[in-house]
Amino acid sequence: MGFTEETVRFKLDDSNKKEISETLTDVYASLNDKGYNPINQIVGYVLSGDPAYVPRYNNARNQIRKYERDEIVEELVRYYLKGQGVDL
């Protein structure tokens, strides 16, 4: 499959947005509880897809794996842009 010069639209199901946000908050807390740097661990997971970056503690690994990594990235970008005052 080759790349195209046409812009491709990507759409995340709106019902997942809140769930992803809550999951990231829970995973962050679990990583923090275990003494990890939560940001580094979440970034490692998102970039690599390796679930070993997230512990099984408090079911964090299973929680984050419920979502595709692109869905997580979309929610992170949306949250960041809203924080910067961008009207989405």
Curated annotation (Swiss-Prot):
A Pfam cross-reference name:
IreB
Query: Which superkingdom heads the taxonomic lineage of this protein's source?
Result: Bacteria
Q: Into which family does the record put it?
A: Belongs to the UPF0297 family.
**Protein name per UniProt:** UPF0297 protein SPD_0180
Listed InterPro entries: IreB
What is the taxonomic lineage of the source species?
Answer: Bacteria, Bacillati, Bacillota, Bacilli, Lactobacillales
